[in-house]
């Protein structure tokens, strides 16, 4: 069975990795939707879809995980059309994993099996928490897979986030 999960992954962190491992324990493969793919260079969404793709693929491959598809998904300004938009971009799938109430409802109404997940260590493993640690100069690397830390270093991501945090907008 093939599953689908969508997230912003700003950045991809250890909680995401654990969730993907659980999904792959229950399914043959997973489609990972890189959500809000059109956004980057903002404090909430600092990384491009391509950078997030590199973070996720590097982390999964370093962990020996190869049964996945990565698909950038731009937002659509019409909720009833969003599932059809996702379907047009991805291989077929049977299950959806999400804790987002709107995403649950939209896929449920289209007949998908929708499952929730327990979020692990949410205080430490959240994109907001990790980005805030970067701004404050705290240790954020323990909260992301080593491959993700290397990508963020390679693209000078911490400096980007700090610059964005100083914006007056």
UniProtKB/Swiss-Prot annotation:
Q: Which reaction is the catalytic activity of this chain? A: beta-nicotinamide D-ribonucleotide + ATP + H(+) = diphosphate + NAD(+)
**Protein name (Swiss-Prot/TrEMBL):** Nicotinamide-nucleotide adenylyltransferase
CDD domains per the UniProt record, alphabetical: NMNAT_Archaea (cd02166)
Question: Where does this chain mainly localize?
Answer: cytoplasm
**Source species:** Picrophilus torridus (strain ATCC 700027 / DSM 9790 / JCM 10055 / NBRC 100828 / KAW 2/3)
Instruction: List the GO biological process terms.
Output: NAD biosynthetic process
**PANTHER family reported for this sequence:** BIFUNCTIONAL NMN ADENYLYLTRANSFERASE_NUDIX HYDROLASE, PHOSPHOPANTETHEINE ADENYLYLTRANSFERASE
Q: What is its EC number?
A: 2.7.7.1
* Molecular functions (GO terms): ATP binding; nicotinamide-nucleotide adenylyltransferase activity
User: Which branch of life, at top level?
Assistant: Archaea
């Amino acid at each position: 069975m093939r599953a689908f999960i969508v997230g912003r992954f700003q950045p991809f962190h250890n909680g995401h990795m654990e969730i993907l491992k659980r999904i792959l324990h229950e399914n043959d493969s997973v489609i990972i939707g890189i959500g809000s793919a059109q956004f980057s260079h903002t404090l909430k969404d600092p990384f491009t879809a391509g950078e997030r793709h590199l973070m996720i693929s590097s982390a999964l491959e370093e962990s020996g995980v190869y049964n996945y598809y990565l698909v950038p998904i731009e937002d659509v300004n019409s909720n009833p059309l969003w599932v059809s938009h996702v379907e047009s971009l991805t291989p077929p799938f049977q299950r959806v994993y999400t804790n987002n109430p709107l995403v649950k409802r939209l896929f449920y109404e289209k007949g998908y099996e929708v499952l929730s997940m327990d979020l692990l260590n949410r205080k430490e493993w959240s994109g907001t928490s990790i980005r805030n640690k970067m701004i404050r100069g705290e240790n954020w690397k323990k909260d992301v897979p080593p491959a993700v830390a290397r990508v963020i270093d390679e693209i000078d991501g911490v400096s980007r986030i700090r610059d964005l945090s100083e914006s007056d907008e």
